């Protein structure tokens, strides 16, 4: 049994004085931790980092290159504008009007600019004439609807085919044969265009009057939504009769407005002296033909 002052095995054998000289401190003989190997004190500054740097002056060169490209494009656009202006001026001197398609705006099909190309005192009349063209389109389209109902009720497919033919021939025909000549006549005061308009607008009015009545000449008249077929089918098929009566009203309205338009155009034509010009042109043409 050990004594009171037996040596404690957990005590360090060498006592260290903390106030002793640091240079004379003995190394711990019983240290259980091995010191870490020394690390180089480079702090990462020794590694080379590749940073892509542009060459001096390359940014300025790119800017100059882009500036030259923009100047070249600008010069090309200016040259094209000048060429287009020269062509337009030459066409204007020759009496040729370049008609760019601008109507309808969502899908341009025709050139139409009453506000900028027609005289102010004639714009109202031109707008009403344009309304008669749109009225013809509406009447022919409704005619297809009315005849389609009659076909469904057992009237036969032939009248429907005729109604479609009226539409696909009347819509472009009305524009080419009488509306565009009137537009050009008001724009350039051309006696020839006035004469062309009067001829085919009269045929347009006669067709509308014929369609409003729809006499039983072709397939009992049921290919046109007029008053006579409306009365004929109303007792047996009320819906078809109502549709035909609506078509009759559209053709009547189209006829009345068209008669007013041709009267107003003729009054302007006589008052402007174009009638005399037309007679002189006709006499001159007859003289050339005789010679």
Swiss-Prot record:
Alphabetically sorted, this entry's keywords are: Cell membrane, Coiled coil, Cytoplasmic vesicle, Membrane, Phosphoprotein, Transmembrane, Transmembrane helix, Transport
Coiled-coil annotation reads: 58-94
Query: How is this protein positioned relative to the membrane?
Result: Multi-pass membrane protein
Q: Which residues are on the Cytoplasmic side of the membrane? A: 1-126, 263-288
Q: Name one GO cellular component term.
A: transport vesicle membrane
The record's subcellular locations are: Cell membrane; Cytoplasmic vesicle, Secretory vesicle membrane
Sites of Phosphoserine modification: 34
- Tell me which Pfam families the record gives: SCAMP (PF04144)
The GO biological-process annotations, alphabetized, read as: protein transport
The record ties this protein, via InterPro entries, to: SCAMP
Q: What is its main location?
A: membrane
Q: Where are the bilayer-spanning segments? A: 127-147, 159-179, 194-214, 242-262
* Disordered as annotated region, ranges: 1-66
Q: What does the record give as the function of this protein?
A: Probably involved in membrane trafficking.
Q: Give the family per the record.
A: Belongs to the SCAMP family.
Question: What name goes with this protein?
Answer: Secretory carrier-associated membrane protein 5
Q: What organism, scientifically named, is this protein from?
A: Arabidopsis thaliana (Mouse-ear cress)
Which gene name does the record give?
A: SCAMP5
